[in-house]
């Protein structure tokens, strides 16, 4: 049982802080974020991000989207070494054409051992189960219609979402997201900035559309439909896409 919480603590080193703050800005109109259908993805193409912690490259993150019957499946791998510790996260996420969850599974491999996290849905219930050292803890909750499932520290989840909606500058989009590693749902406010921002991605300087989320303390940088960088200022982490 102790290891479950220890591993969860390790995961949160690399994830965003769950500090919930009210975010409001009168200059932005507000719309609900709704996905009508999945679009803008490349079937079977591996997307790779370099993982930086405190400006030091500590690993990589990759994801792939494939068709899975009438649904879609996203496989992700995070491989990080930081502070003398190794951490590997392998996830499989199945979702429908509206980007709503069907099932989720995560395997966490760390120096302390292996932890399995799974999320299942039944009727209006959502349950995350955490298994370590042969002990399973179930964390039940109510599923609200339209809630997205997103691993906040994994850019693939966000990139598929952003590619599947038409985002307008100067608009704040609201949504509910369920984060399996926290086994909780959060209200998110995605603010699309009116002005582009120049950033370096590898050796290229790109003028990016900027999306900020205050509750999860995340910043996203979009260039020509691609999520090229995701930042968590509070955690000192940056995930930057390898452009090919």
Identify the role of each PLM range.
Residues 19, 141, 157-163, 190:
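Generic hydrophobic, helix-prone segments enriched in Leu/Val/Ile
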Residues 78, 108, 130-132, 159:
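Short, structured patches in soluble enzyme cores that scaffold and shape functional sites
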Residues 130-155:
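Acidic/charged, solvent-exposed loop-and-adjacent secondary-structure segments enriched in E/D, K/R, S/T
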Residues 5, 13-123, 169-244:
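Acidic, serine/threonine-rich low-complexity disordered tracts
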Residues 147-170:
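Beta-strand/loop-rich accessory regions of lumenal/periplasmic or secreted enzymes
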Residues 2-8:
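Short, hydrophobic alpha-helical membrane anchors of single-pass surface/secreted proteins
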Residues 124-128:
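A short, hydrophobic/aromatic-rich structural module that often spans a beta strand
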């Amino acid at each position: 049982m102790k290891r479950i919480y220890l591993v969860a603590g390790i995961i949160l080193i690399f994830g965003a802080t769950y500090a919930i703050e009210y975010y409001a800005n009168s200059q932005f109109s507000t719309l609900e974020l709704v996905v009508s259908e999945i679009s803008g993805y490349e079937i079977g193409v591996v997307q790779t991000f370099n993982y930086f912690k405190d400006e030091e490259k500590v690993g990589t993150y990759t994801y792939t989207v494939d068709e899975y019957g009438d649904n879609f499946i996203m496989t992700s791998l995070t491989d990080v070494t930081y502070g003398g510790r190794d951490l590997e996260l392998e996830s499989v996420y199945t979702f429908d054409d509206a980007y709503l969850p069907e099932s989720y599974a995560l395997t966490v491999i760390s120096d302390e051992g292996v932890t399995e996290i799974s999320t299942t849905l039944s009727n209006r219930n959502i349950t995350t189960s955490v298994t370590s050292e042969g002990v399973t803890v179930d964390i039940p909750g109510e599923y609200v219609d339209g809630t997205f499932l997103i691993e906040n520290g994994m850019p693939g989840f966000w990139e598929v979402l952003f590619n599947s909606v038409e985002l307008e500058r100067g608009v704040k989009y609201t949504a509910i997201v369920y984060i399996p590693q926290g086994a909780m749902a959060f209200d998110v406010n995605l603010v699309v900035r009116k002005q582009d921002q120049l950033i370096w991605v590898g050796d290229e300087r790109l003028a990016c559309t900027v999306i900020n989320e205050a509750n999860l303390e995340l910043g996203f940088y979009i260039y020509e439909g691609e999520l090229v960088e995701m930042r968590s200022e509070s955690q000192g982490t940056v995930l930057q896409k390898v452009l090919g």
